[in-house]
Amino acid sequence: MTTSAAASVAEFSDHATTETLATLLHDWAARLGDEIAVTFLDYRTSDDGRAGFLTWRELDDRVSAVAARAAELAAPGERAAVLVEQSADYVVAFLGAIRAGLVAVPLFAPNLPGHAGRLTAVLADCDPRLALTTAPQLDQVREFVDPKRTELVAVDLVPPAREREWPVPEPDDLAYLQYTSGSTRSPAGVMLSHRNVLANARQACAAYGAVTGRTTTVSWLPLFHDMGLVLGIAAPMAAGIGTTLLDPVAFLESPGRWLRALSASPGAISAAPNFAYGYSASRVSEREKSYLELSRVVSLINGSEPVLPSTIAQFQAAFGGCGLDPAVHRASYGLAEATVLVSVTDAGEPSRQVAFDRDRLAAGAAVPAGSGASSTLVSCGHAAGQQLRIVDPEKRQAVPDGKVGEIWVRGENVGRGYWRNPTTSAETFGLRLDGTDGWLATGDLGVLFDGELYVTGRRKDLVIVDGRNHYPQDIEQTVEAHPAVRRHSAAAFAIPLDEGEGAVVVLERAKNLADGEANLTAAAEGLRAEVAARHGLKLTDLVFLAPGEVPRTSSGKISRSACRARYLDGAFADRRLS
């Protein structure tokens, strides 16, 4: 990082005991005034993306107005759910809650398809005193909250506020709850303090080269997503840089919109899951490319799901002719429990790719491949201002470089635990290693090779498709509720695909399901539709087995790992219905 970048990020860091994202906003508003802080490209009302702007001063004034109203209705430390569509109003609502001393809960508008179950579960878990939304969403929000327990505020209707004093939190007071599970039954809210988010925002700014007056962030990631929130709100507040936001749907409808926003934003820093880079490369036309100027892009972060070498190459081949420098690709690793960012590749250098011996890697050793089968992994670089170790999770001891183990992290960015879940918190946070406390067990597997982190898999059984996390037990419960499926027989897992990861379910048919391909095909169609409706997930494959054929452990539990291994070995090839 350059000296000027470091100075820019650190300039407003002298009073760490009272800093929040909202106090930083006030400082930048005093300094930057009428410069643009937030740009939202609205493709809901205009095919061309009507641009709306908030200056630093306007943003600060609107945040104060929302905070003043929020403070009338809720006490410091109570929760404020943010139920706003992707927009500048979302930024206002989130920062308004923080300025009022409330614990923000970044969520989404109730009209987001396929998420009603999750919204209901999260609202029940966080028990908000306040729901921040916009006027068009008020009626829908009322269907999800108890008016006796939760007050509603339309942030776009709040009048200006008079000057007043705001609560001064301690650094370790909660700033927000980052919900991670996507489950409709067991949501997990990571407790993140002001210290946590400011530490990680500054770690990100330092790693990505954010410089006041010279860089901007560009993001279509959901603002309720950990990466979207830090990139779209926290990092800009830390460094005093503008942000340009798009709705995720706008990107999915036409990925060229993201590329045009990058082209129009000098010094652009952006991030996306691996799938988005391949999606963009295959969907942006040559005509669209002719209008792009990408030579001023500073960093393109690739994270949130496994980074594939083929995708990086595909994206660079597609847009290299538009001036895109291959050195801007930054493979990254992170998780919500560490706010978001843990490690990233060095600036100005293409990400390292190493072909490891596949069998040795599966056995726990990272050895460059010879003539045998190989697995090529992309380096996720070095820890970003925090400590990182590879650990034997059973012995809780660090392992040597070149050995696969669980990734453990320690730093000021690591959260306090899971909201109202002390048991799981104690298993994950504040662990002891090498004589020091405060370590986070990530549940992910990786290896340090030549000093850089390579993520090899997941100790947890998360299924990650298109950048979204799905817990397999949730998918399994949905599948097992179908009358064609034997109870307690389904195994859901991820498999590698050329464009990322796919989701597979292997299950046992119910004993009363009549034999015949037509019956199985009809059942499979119903199951696919149910999984898509409940989880927003398109299954790559669905396999019906006879009762008793799904692999189980000695205690009778379904063994996802054994099932996945047999699937990848082709043991179920003749049972596929896809």
For each predicted feature, which ranges?
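Conserved pre-ATP/AMP-binding loop-to-beta segment of ANL
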Residues: 33-36, 162-186, 196, 200, ...
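Conserved AMP-binding/adenylate-forming core of the ANL superfamily
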Residues: 38-74, 78-91, 112-120, 168, ...
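AMP-binding/adenylate-forming catalytic core of the ANL superfamily
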Residues: 131, 263, 270, 411, ...
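Gly/Ser/Thr-rich phosphate-binding loop
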Residues: 267-271, 283-373, 387-389, 395-396
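Conserved ANL (AMP-binding/adenylate-forming) active-site segment centered on the GW(Y/F)…HTG consensus within
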Residues: 359-377, 397, 414-443, 476
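Conserved beta-loop-beta connector loops within the AMP-binding
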Residues: 365-382, 387-408, 450
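Conserved C-terminal "lid"/linker of ANL adenylate-forming enzymes
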Residues: 489-493, 504-505, 528-578
